[in-house]
């Protein structure tokens, strides 16, 4: 979400985040959860922003417990990793909104232009050498963003990809093709590990690594 100095707010679609070992693995937008939960999350974030008289982009993360209740996990008073999907999939990105809010400009439109899955690229991919980006970029629905970091370390966020598709199922299929799902060969040169599944409404995946 983003809040202006005059109290006006704009909300991006609720994001479904999947983590591995405490690091964001991928985000699914729109989230695959009940609309009632999404409305509750927006109301809670709005109350927090108003109480703090906050100006700018604010990310509020929640857990959903076994009873279906929302529990606030953390707040990030800045553009956030889980908002990187907005660069390609929304009318205005979270970075546009940060500038607009801080400069007193009207807040931009947050409308989602396409369903999208954002996946982090971790330093594990650089274990042996620079990844073969030409293999990854064979997918026309995919947009690659690298951060220009010189040193790659396991778990360090080196970039991300946004996969846009007519629906989430198709976007996840591209993600599965990149990772290899254990039922077909992995993409040559990328070394994405097999997908694993956990309890919840969507898949959870192992950390990325470069193939041997």
Each model region followed by its residue ranges:
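Peripheral (often C-terminal) accessory segments that flank ATP-dependent C-N-forming ligase machineries
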Residues: 100-212
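Short, acidic Gly/Pro/Ser/Thr-rich loop/turn segments
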Residues: 7-10, 19-21, 80, 126, ...
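A general structural signal for well-ordered alpha-helical segments in protein cores
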Residues: 11, 42, 95, 155-158
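Active-site "cap" helix and flanking loop/linker of ATP-utilizing ligase/carboxylase catalytic domains
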Residues: 39-60, 66, 76-125, 130
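Conserved protein kinase catalytic/activation segment
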Residues: 68-70
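Short, flexible active-site loops
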Residues: 22-32, 74-87
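Internal nucleotide-binding/catalytic subdomain
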Residues: 1-60, 64-66
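Generic beta-structure capping elements
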Residues: 14-17, 75-78, 147
